[in-house]
């Protein structure tokens, strides 16, 4: 039997490969990488062959291939899910596989699942900034989140299996992720290098010829740079490998990927300034997206909410993000240029 730690990861290619590719690249560079056996689920057989050259064992399949996913999870000491955080069939397949592993070995595998700060959303529709700040070290506050909120159906299902004693679960909630990923998997053409949220807002603004916001753009969201988010996953993994008894899990196992916060007006104003400089708008001042534009270009009112939070648990792992709001805003000119060069798929799920 292998003495290596088997880590199974999904979401390393296509749009979801922005997070998953970054995490996988970090694992491949990890000081203990030779002690890992890494398997990865992906749909593209060509990219699967490329992954082999990195020492990763590809498993060709999609999130709908639940039997494949269940088997991969049943063979894993640790599962890291970074694909579609609302895809219930694949999540339940992972949970079934990890339960089978527990029943066969008596050992609780670790499940690091990617959720999102969209779970914290209110119904502000861009009209006000909330004074509610969620803390990842306050399980009572987080348990009170409505089950109808984004991601809660999957999050609570995972927590329930942890409570039953079959797994140790850890929920990572990234916020607005920014920056262009630059690592070996991107350069090999395997992983996606671009975020989802801002390119969608920017592309919608370019199509209307003017920077846009939901409502007044007053709502507040957190943000995190992609490389620093990848570091959070690795710090969490390291803590679990070193001594899982010291790491909060289950209903207490939330870890926010949030370094700073911004208003959507602030972001859209900077987008507008870039559009003016690039000849794509005459005025940098954002205006409200119309109902028709929201239905045509965007995924509804997902980004019109407040989702304020404090990353207490994440920082307790030793996570010390350095890139803040000013860096995020400064990155948007490049994003506008990127969206002009290659328009982004609209109406994508962005939280």
Identify what each model region corresponds to.
Residues 2-33:
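N-terminal Rossmann NAD(P)H-binding glycine-rich loop of SDR-like oxidoreductase domains
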Residues 40-105:
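NAD(P)H-binding glycine-rich loop region in Rossmannoid oxidoreductase-like domains
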Residues 85-89, 96-197:
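Glycine-/Pro-rich loop/turn segments that contact NAD(P) or position catalytic residues
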Residues 180-199, 236-254:
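Glycine/proline-rich active-site loop of Rossmann-fold NAD(P)-dependent oxidoreductases
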Residues 199-227, 232-235, 247:
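A conserved pocket-lining segment of Rossmann-fold NAD(P)-dependent short-chain dehydrogenase/reductase
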Residues 210-211, 239-298, 345-351:
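Mid/C-terminal beta-alpha module of Rossmann-like enzyme folds, strongest
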Residues 291-321:
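Conserved C-terminal active-site "lid" loop/helix of NAD(P)H-dependent oxidoreductases
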Residues 325-351:
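Amphipathic terminal alpha-helices
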